[in-house]
Amino acid sequence: MCPPSAINISPVFRGPTTPAAVCFQVIRLKQPVTRTHLFQHSTHSQPTIARAVTALIDAHLVRERPDKIVAEGPGRPKIPLEMTPTPWVHVGVALGTKSTYLGIYGTRGQLLREQFVEITPAKHRMSAFIAEIIPHINAMVASTQLPLANIGISASGVVREQKFITAPNLGWDGEDIVTPFARLFDVPITVASVVEAIAGAEQQTQEPPLRPIGSEPLADHRGLIFYVDDTTGAAIHTRTSV
């Protein structure tokens, strides 16, 4: 059994906790939704939810859709909310033994572009490897005509300090992949192990639980993931951590 000291909490993947983040998560997964639905899946007050929605609208991430109002009897109609068309894109890079996957995603997590680059990292210096994939990333982002928001990188093996990768199948021993990317892209860059990234992706598919009734405890959720391929690993994800 793995000793407790060997179990790490991911510094990269955190579930939504702020009112705006919780609202955004629910809208992203269940759109169109009303403010009432958001209140039902939050522990925050109705005024707090209203302020969170206003902040998301002001940030051009969410919009009201009066044309989708469904009559539900007397009273003020509830205006549905949905996400706006993605205002920027996110890049995902999955490093493999013989090929690297590149994906361009919108704010809802939808795939916009994808490409495999056939390259064996173990046969190249880090600088040469990055020089090979950067033109593909630039071309894919340019084709969307949208600004780049951030870059996420997953790799086999072990990732330390969100920066250094040690993976025998890649031929890397404590290689720094963040600094070369940071020289070329002025956006946040995150790095995680592949099993950590898979758990983080699963975490982002979980809708916040319904508001508890009275003293009833908040419903919990846990998922256990095993990964066996060029590397092996395991991770547990909850709604708030990996």
Model region roles, listed by residue range:
Residues K30, K68-V70, P217:
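A short, glycine- and basic residue-enriched loop/turn
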Residues G75-R113, R222-V242:
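Gly/Thr-rich phosphate-binding beta-strand-loop-beta motif of the actin/hexokinase/Hsp70
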Residues M1-H41:
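Extreme N-terminal segment that seeds HTH/winged-HTH DNA-binding domains in transcriptional regulators
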Residues V53-T54:
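Short, hydrophobic-biased segments on the C-terminal half of alpha helices
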Residues L111, E118-G214, H221:
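Glycine-rich phosphate-binding loop and adjoining helix at the ATP-binding site
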Residues I57-P74:
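Beta-hairpin "wing" of winged helix-turn-helix
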